[in-house]
Every structure is written in structure tokens, then in C-alpha cells.
Amino acid sequence: MKRIERTLLSLCFLLPVGMPVLADEKLDNKDYVNVNETKQSAIRGRIVDNSGQTLPGATIYIESLHTGVISDINGFYTFANLNPGTYKVSVHYVGYSTAEATITVPEGTTIVRDFTLNEGIELQEVVVGGTFQGQRRALASQKNALGITNVVSADQVGKFPDSNIGDALKRISGINVQYDQGEARFGQVRGTSADMSSVTINGNRVPSAEGETRNVQLDLIPADMIQTIEVNKVVTPDMDADAIGGSINLVTKNSPYKRFITATAGTGYNAVSDKMNLNLGFTYGDRFFNDKLGLMASVSYQNNPAGSDDVEMAYEMDDDGNVYLDEYEIRQYYVTRERQSYSLALDWIINENHKLDFKGIFNNRNDWENRYRLTNKFMDPEDVGGATDRYEMIYEGKAGGPDQRNARLERQRTMDFTLGGEHLFGRLKFDWKASYAKASEYRPNERYLALKLEDVAMDTDWSDIRRPYMSPKSGSFPVLDASNTYGFELDELTEQFEDIQEKDMKFSANFELPLKQGAFNNKLKFGAKVVDKDKHMDIDFFEYTPLDEDAFLTDVLGHLHNQDRDGYMAGDRYRVGNFVDKEYIGGLNLTNASEYEQEEKLDEEAENFDAHETVTSGYIRFDQQLGRHWALMAGLRLENTHVSYSGFVYNDGDQDGSDEESLTPTGKQSKSYINVLPALLLKWDVNDDLKLRASFTNTLARPKYANLVPNVIIDKEDIAFGNPDLKATLSYNVDLSAEYYFKSVGLVSAGLFYKKINDFIVDYRDQNYEYQGTVYDEMSTPINAGDANLFGVEVAYQRDFGFIHPALKCVGLYGNYTYTYSKVNHFNFEGRENDDMRLPGSPEHTANLSLYFEKAGFNLRWSYNFASDFIDEVGESSFYDRYYDKVNYMDVNASYTFGKQFKTTIYADVTNLLNQPLRYYQGTPDRSMQAEYYGVRFNAGVKVTF
């Protein structure tokens, strides 16, 4: 692999020198124009359709120069380095008539020329209408990309019943998503875990509101706030390298070509909450001051009362190999999820050579959650006279203060504000961006009140092995009641305050210099970027003891409410019973010293940390056209990472006999490292419809924030360490793909990919671990666990059936399938070195299938999504491995669009028709760890475009 790197490094620097020589040998003077003393000129402009919508991925071609360019995501194009003269320019786009213009360019002048294309032409007797507009734009961008990219437009997202970006992503080949409360939260690309891929907004990496990871919560961003989704499965040197799986780029709405107004209103229903939801959206765009200033503003609001029915288990094995339930929980969740999102795009065209733009997006999600949890926890036989069937029964309610609606409030926010410029100085193009981004999670007044009953003899019913059920041997199920018949006592009364923040400052500059024109044209691109990150996690945790516990318990038991819900989806026999009212928990005046004694819980605060990270990068990229059909790109990226972390050492005092808790700052620990990352991409345009690609790239994934914190947590017989010496995970990637684009809009594609992944990270656990002379029962720490090979195959097909018979043009199919195989090598995990293990986060199979009917404004679509199970967390042995189970999602949606001046769409959708639970299992599929059900959901509404 190092030999390959050295070869590619040489190519990166030799190609810019060698290719001009090759071009001189292959071409005569008619095929290219040399750079000379003449002041160079340029042609710039924008490609739009007859409705004013921009057309990304259009091919703009000058025949006399054998030179073409591709319009960018916002429809803009530029020909630089032109000699003065007259040129015939043609514009080509799938499903549109070719547009042509003859443009005369004076010396040293930039000519602005926009093109408007007319749609609806006949292609092989198949009429391409406006119904396929979004799909057409996406495929045009994908078709002309140098690397392997999947592009999804907002119009396409609107064809599916997806309310957030995570749900939209699961429709793309090679992407699997993990869920939270029935909504897609984290995306996994090409068989890699979520922390091995990046999520960007307009090319900027999005900070994470999560405390421990770099993962971005995709359910924060409503789908209707995004113009285009780009999934770059092959990253080029001008992109951030932290994208082993790929880079998911969310392009927000750009300023329009002409006035644009849309409004959306909708509602829906969820059976768990038995309440209606609300969805609102509005977008306004226009141009002002003789089209110098462009503006696009959007707002989205969603209020979704929902919930879930959940059972969870944890298993242990005794010395004789018998499996028993160590913990058993029945949970009832009620969640109200509110999203607010605002975006603004501005651009100012100073003149034909200079433009400034601003893009900003702000997303806020409030989760008000009440959880009612009944737990049976296995008791140590030594504590109950040697009995092996005794459990502690705990009724716990989660709530918040009155200002948080007596529910646990989790407020997560992400924002990104970017100011940039594009400038043309002769033949040199220069662009820059300065941005500020922030993500935060705020949890105030998170309260828990729990009552317990010890030494309850329990039986386990294993008749349905996937749904074990525990019941008291006495036959009488202990419940909470006002008279405290069973003798429950206070177990927990706590309150937590959490504040997590990550702030990013970024600046980047890019230069692009065309060197030669003609069939062997080439250009050099280079640039630099600085990213400065600050992240901190601050938790304050307090435990309260009532001064008169008997009076408090009597008062508590006078405020009970039955939380059993008819039709509990995990099974009718799972019942949570009576719990303390959320209003009572929220109304407690815990700061009243005459009623409660407060104790700060240092063990809960031991994971607090401060982190600072600076990534300074630079790159060089050389693009060489090899005639009309071949294109080559060679490049190199250098990234210098400097990290500085500080945490805490916590000791509960048990092991040293002091019985005194301590929490001691670690001080800052710093580390720096440099990654040299070559890339080589090759594209063969066999013809206008068939595209072949091959690439070699080198990418990385930085460790999770919490893993690098140099903390030590000693809690009774257990000890946990952070690991500031963790290495970044590196990957060497080889990709091959073939795509054939149908003229009637659609494609069939196949791809192979291979990743050699070094130093992937897992949480390591060990028994009887000695630290500073003391032996601890269990130790845990993150480690670089070894290497892995990941191989995959992707196939995709999307097309209407008009090729069978014109009458079937209104019926079509969208489908894709991805197979991945991974194997861990040199597993650095004591006791598991010889285990045959897959890479964590790597499902073997993912698939999508969608059948649609579209005609005369009516759209009906059936969609299916599948992903196989995968290992999610590595345990100390295979018995403790945690797996994310396979999923099957089925949705149906319909819409009807009518009107011209006021284009109106009425829509309705039904999602999760199979009532797919979020399910984890321990070791084997029959050993359920969690089964959380959300039920079928309904939505309907109307959208109007002016």
C-alpha cells in the first residue's frame, strides 16, 4: 500500500508537467489555444429552464475549442482563459432542447450569457414532461461528476413521505440509517459506522450536538429546507478527508433566477400519542436592483406528538452456562418533537467577474419526553441469602420542571452561517469562504423519581424466546398504590442539568488556473483551509434526600397515575402500571433546604470535558482531459490535526478506604499528527450515455471526542479510562463504477468498492485489571482494535416502463441494492483475537424498491426499505456483542398537482406500514435487548407554489 502511495504522490507532481507535453504531441494548432501575451477573456452565465428553475449538471460546450464545462449545483458555468474571438456555444441537458448561441468576446472582457432551455422534447418517441423534473436534474449532476456521486433533488425527496433528511437518505444506494423515536437519526454509508462518514452543509462539516461523538443528528433538519442532497462516495483532494464511508453534503436553497414563492400546510396522526401533528413551511425568493441582489428565505415548523412502546433486556450467564435475565424493563414513552428551521441565502453580483454570497441555516429541535420505566434488576445472591431468583423491582418516572411542560426537555440546535466570494482575475478563478457553525444540546431540570421493592422472587417465561416475560412467583404483581401495600421505598430523587456545545470557525481559499484548452485541456486547482473547533460538555447532577422520608413517600403515593396503554405494541402482557404523576415530579421544590438535603453527584460529572481541535489543510489537484472521452484527476491533500483535551479523574474512595469522593482535573493533554492523502480518479465517457469511473483515494476518521479525553473514573470495583493516544482511523479506497443513462430519464448502474481500514476503534473491556496496585473487576477503555477489509457491490435501476409500451410511461421503478462483506484482521482485543468478526456498523445487505404511477398530475408511490442486521457494539466476548437487528420499512404516499399560475399539490402518506420496531439483540437474534415500537403514522397536507 505504501508503494501505491509513493507512486500516486509522484503522479500528482509529474502529471502537471507531463500532460502539457503529451498534449503538444497529440494535437495540432487547431485543437487548442496556447496561453500567450494576449489578455485573456471569459464567458460566464447561468443555465435555467423556462420556469426559471436552475439546471445543475448541464454540459456547455465550445466546439471549436473541443472544450466543455459543467454547470454547478446552482446552474452557474464559467469559461476562462479564452482568446478574444467569436465562439459558438451549445448547451445540452437530458430531456431539454439543445440551446445554441454565437458569442463574440473582446480582449480582456468577461461576457455574461445566460441560457434558457425548453423542456418537453420527444426522445425516441417518449415525451419527457415536468413530472420527472427533479429526477432529471439530479441525474444530470450525477452523470457529469468526475467521482462516484449520488444526487437527490428536493423534488425527488418530495416524491417520498420523508419529513427529515435522515429518512430521505435511506432511499439512496449504500446508505443505512439508525432510528430514534421512529425517525432516522444517523446515516451509515457503504458498510461503515456513522462516525466514519461526514455530514456537511454547503460543503462545511456540521458540528455535532451529541456529547461524545462527531455524528450529526440528521433528524434535526427538515427535508423541505434542502435544495439538493449530494452523497460523495469518492472524495477529491479539494474536499475534507474525514469521510471513509463518504461525504453527505446538504445544499440549502439558493437564491432564484426569478420570483419564487411556496407555502405548505399539513397535519397527521400518531396512534401512541393519540394526537394530531402540525407541519408548516414557507419559502420566498426573488431578485432586486436590476437582478444584482438575489434572496431566498425559508421557514419550516413541525410539531409531532408521538411516543413508543418499548421492552429492554440484558442477559448474563452463570458458571454452568445457563442464561438468565440480568435486567428486564418495560417502558412507555410519550414524546412531543418540535422542529423549527430557518434559512437565508443572499448573493450580490458586483460585476461580471466578482460575486459575493451568504448562506445561513438555523435548526432547533425541542424534545419533551416523559418516560415511565418498570425495571426488574437481578440481585447478587450474596445479598439475598444465596437465592438466584431474586430481583429488585423499580418504578421510575422521568420528568422536568414546570417551565419544561413537566417533561424532560432536550433542546438541540445546529446553525451554520457562511460568507463567501467568487472572483475571476483574468484566467485565474478564486473563491473563498468564512463560516461560523455551532451545535448545542441543552437539558435543564431533568428529573427522575424512582421507588423500589427488593427481594422479589421472579419466574421467567421463555416460551416466546424473543419476548421473555417475568412475573412474581407469588402470583401477585407488586404495584404502586396509595396505601403502599407492598412496601415500596424511595430509590432515587435526582435532577440533572446538561449543556453541550461545539463551535466551529472555518476559512477556506481555492484557486483554479486553466492551463491549456482543446481536447487535451487541463487545469490546476489548489487551496487551503483552517478549521478551529471548541467543544465542551458540562453536566451538573444532584441527588436529593427528603428530610422526612416517610411523609414524602406518603405524599408521593397520593399522586399516582396509571400509564397502561391499550394496544401496547410490544405485547399485551407487558404493562407498566401506576407511576408518580409527571406534574407532581415537576412541581417539587427541590431547592427548599427545609425539605430536602442536596448532594452533588461527582460520579455523574466525571465525564465532563473541554476539547480544542485545529485542522489545517492544503491541497493540489490537477485535472487533465484526455481527448473527448477520457478525464483524469490526480491530487494530494495534507491535513495537520492538533488536539488539546482536558477532563477529570474521579475516585469514589472505596478502593483506597478513604470513603471520600474526589474529582480532580487532569490538565490539558495535546497531540498533533499529519496525514498525507493522495487521490487518483479516472473517467471514461464511452459515449454520451455510458460512463465508467475508477479511483484510488485515501481518507480518515478522527476518534470520537469523548474517547480522547484523558479521564479516569473509578467506581467501586470498576475502572474506565479515556485514551488520548488513539490514532485516527485510515482507509485506502478503490472504487469502480459503470452507469448507463437512458434518454427517457433514468439509469442503470453497478459499482464495486474496496476499503482497507487501519486502526478502527472499539470500546475494550477486561476483567481483573490492575491499576496503581489495585485490582478492579472490570476495566473499559477505547482502543485501536485492528484492521479490516471491506468489500462491496452496488447496483441501481430507475426508469419508467415506457420502453416496453408508450402507455406504460406513467409507471416506473426505482430500486437499488448494496452488498458489503467485511472482515476484521489482527484484532487487538484480548480473548477475541481469533474471532471471525465483521466491522462494527456494517450491514451485509441494504435495499430499496419503489414502484410509482405518475400521470396528469397524479402521483402514487409504494416504497420499501431493507437493511440486514449488523454488530453495533463489541463486548468482552461474543455473548455480550450488541447487534442492530434487520429492518423492513414500507410506506405509501399519493399526491395530486394542478394549476399553472398557482401550482397546488395535495398530498397524503402512510409510513411504517409494517410497524417495524427498533430492535437490538445480544449475541444471537433470539436474545432481544430492545424492541421499541412506534406504530403506523399518517400525514396529509397541501403545498402551493406562486
Task: Kindly label every feature range from the protein language model.
Residues 7, 492-500, 508-514, 521-524, ...:
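Conserved C-terminal beta-signal and adjacent last beta-strands/turns
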Residues 606, 610, 721-727, 747-812, ...:
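Outer membrane beta-barrel strand-and-loop segments of large Gram-negative receptors
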Residues 166-205:
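Extracytoplasmic beta-strand/coil segments of soluble accessory domains associated
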Residues 80, 205-233:
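Short acidic/polar hinge/loop motifs at secondary-structure boundaries
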Residues 111-115, 165-168, 185-188, 200, ...:
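N-terminal periplasmic accessory domains that precede
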Residues 24-40, 48-53, 58-63, 92-96, ...:
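Short, acidic, small-residue-rich periplasmic hinge/interaction motif at the N-terminus
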Residues 274-380, 402, 412-419, 426, ...:
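Transmembrane beta-barrel wall of Gram-negative outer-membrane proteins
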Residues 754-756, 774-870:
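Gram-negative outer-membrane beta-barrel transporters
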